[in-house]
């Protein structure tokens, strides 16, 4: 795997993204100043070893090892999802959105572009669109619980915030641990407990719950 870093002085990130895509066999997966997205096939250990993730330095991260049920099995359809062309908004999602195509058509008519047919991508674009209109992350996520139909739990990452939302039916699991200087979220409690050498206290968010942490 290759990683390249360069400086771009213009604020027109969509122009940059489209310019990169003119290079043959090149696809842009994310853009921004605070987040770096790694998308590939394989389990967490395989991807971490391939990209040297143990050497990454940062304040927070999100990831998702999933079984594709309604999308292709390829890098483009892997999580996390980025909201093209906004910088530093990424989402991982567990569940199904039943009004995906309706919301997608609305956003496409507003000029948004989608890079996959996975319903998870709509959440990233939806949140980025709300925030571009001046709505903060927490309120954007609360709005999503009423405007996105289906069963879902998702996590959003920006350059300085981490948020989780659970739909009104709360059918998709989420477990949270909040320590003095760390927050961990996972679909299964064992995934969190395997990280910490000491006993921890976790909790399950309620239905229609949203939490946002500053990082």
Task: State each model region's role.
Residues 1-215:
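Conserved short alpha-helical segments that host acidic/polar catalytic motifs at enzyme active sites
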């Amino acid at each position: 795997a290759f990683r390249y870093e360069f400086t771009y002085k213009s604020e027109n990130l969509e122009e940059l993204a489209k310019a990169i895509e003119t290079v043959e066999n090149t696809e842009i997966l994310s853009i921004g100043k605070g987040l770096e997205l790694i998308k590939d096939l394989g389990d967490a250990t395989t991807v971490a070893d391939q990209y040297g993730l143990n050497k990454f330095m940062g304040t927070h991260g999100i990831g998702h090892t999933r079984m594709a049920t309604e999308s292709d099995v390829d890098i483009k359809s892997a999580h996390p999802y980025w909201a093209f062309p906004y910088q530093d908004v990424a989402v991982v999602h567990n569940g199904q959105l039943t009004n995906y195509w309706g919301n997608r058509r609305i956003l496409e008519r507003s000029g948004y572009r989608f890079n996959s047919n996975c319903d998870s991508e709509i959440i990233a674009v939806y949140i980025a669109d709300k925030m571009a209109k001046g709505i903060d992350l927490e309120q954007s996520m609360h709005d999503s619980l009423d405007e996105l139909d289906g069963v879902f739990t998702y996590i959003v990452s920006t350059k300085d915030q981490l948020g989780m939302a659970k739909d009104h039916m709360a059918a998709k699991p989420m477990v949270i641990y909040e320590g003095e200087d760390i927050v961990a979220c996972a679909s299964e409690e064992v995934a969190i407990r395997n990280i910490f050498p000491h006993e921890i206290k976790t909790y399950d968010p309620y239905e229609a719950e949203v939490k946002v942490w500053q990082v």
